[in-house]
């Protein structure tokens, strides 16, 4: 962990099938529908209780599905923060919401209507990155969920630019180098090779960056990643 902190690693956290499930409980409910949220919430809370975010402040963490139940439980967990410490501890109470602001959350998994709005009560748009859960989520569902995120009425264009493009470049600066994007605060500065005004107006560029970012994070084979990078370079 110390080494990952020293290089400012980007770590994406995602649940898998739980190692144990009570027999006969939730038998007819798909595991991703509910258990993934339980595990994500529990994992983040355990990391808070072990001071992971303060001990390793340079690691960039990404938690999935708009933080699962974190935004629902944040007030409650903050209220219990004193009880998480040993009675003899000289350390300050846990800062649950502060730790939420230290990480990134992807917007995958039907988050647009309610969940992301709740999360934005604890963090801001610079903590949100686009996510689709591809390739495990079928393409039609990915497209529908992306459209829902594009049409959110409680996020302005600056917020959406952060979610779809700028935060990805901040997390993976190599993307900015490949695509000729530089981030200055909450604005995008295009190079001399910039896209036409029409392309910028209809946000095709933003959508393309989102797809590339998601593809890079879901491809494990290095050879395939190289092929993706070649295609990205060709876009210039």
Predicted regions and their residues:
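Catalytic pocket-lining loop regions of alpha/beta-barrel enzymes
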Residues: 1-129, 189, 194-207, 213-216
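Short, glycine/acidic-enriched loop or turn micro-motifs at the edges of active sites
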Residues: 17-18, 134-136
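Mid-to-C-terminal alpha-helical segments outside catalytic/metal-binding sites
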Residues: 114, 118, 122-129, 136-236
